[in-house]
């Protein structure tokens, strides 16, 4: 199976998020309606590092959760593009999420999302 990969410009066509609240640079390993991997480089210039935490910057956990949500939204929007045109995909649930280490500036983060179940238009 080929590795389907989409870039930032294609992601912008799929989800409504924009800078400074777009936390997805690339989507790879896409299996429609099943799974994908999101990639983001958190550069030292991210706006939230100024206050979280001064002198010891760390990516806030809620930003990492948002990255997961955007990865999932991009997966679903990519998978059913015609049905989601001009619609927003919402995060409904997160299971088995653990933050094992802090994420520091200039770190590349990968987030794997799996669509475990769906009911109608809810995944």
Task: Label each region the model flagged.
Residues 51-60, 64-74, 91-92:
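Compact, glycine-rich, soluble single-domain proteins
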Residues 2-28:
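Flexible, low-complexity linker/boundary loops enriched in proline and small hydrophobic residues
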Residues 12, 55, 99-101:
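Beta-strand-rich interaction surfaces with strong enrichment in secreted/lumenal proteins
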Residues 31-34, 117-122:
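Short, conserved beta-turn/loop elements at beta-strand boundaries and strand-helix junctions
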